[in-house]
């Protein structure tokens, strides 16, 4: 069988070694006599798999201990609501740099005072808009960006200076493709399917 090379934005190709191991363990994961899909999420073996996954992600991204790592069901668009539902109290500033950033802003408006502080929407998102530090509300609950835009081929080459306002970043299309200092962010989230795993999981 010849493999098809998929250059779409996602779901992306997965390493053949990972697929072969998953296939080999589909009926019996690590000799357990059952598939990982059949395991209780409270079982010792599942906990071991979970802990190792989190440990490897911490190692690869150099995630400090003061940050939690969550493995969540569903795609990253679910976080468009989860972020404001958990963080938006008085107001949030959004950088409208593409389709997904705009969708996140529209969703946030349902939960409180969200405003766009920089946008390239009128230019069909041909570039990432410049973010003037003076435009950021120092009392905002957070500033929201999408670090990379696969649809338009644009990315943030320099993070906005948010002062003491937490920076929230959707890294779905470039997580683990370039180094970031996690301490520059209050929240990072990413759907797994573009860079680090199968569809249906968000970190």
What are these regions (language model features)?
Residues 34-79, 99, 106-107:
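Conserved N-terminal alpha-helix of the aminotransferase class I/II PLP-enzyme fold
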Residues 24-31, 55, 59-63, 110-113, ...:
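Generic secondary-structure signature for well-ordered alpha-helical cores
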Residues 185-203:
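Active-site PLP attachment segment
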Residues 10, 108, 120-175, 187:
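Active-site phosphate-binding strand-loop segment of PLP-dependent enzymes
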Residues 3-54:
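A glycine-/small-polar-enriched, mobile loop at the entrance of the PLP active site in fold-type I
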Residues 6-8, 69-73, 94-96, 116-119, ...:
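General beta-strand structural signal in soluble alpha/beta enzymes
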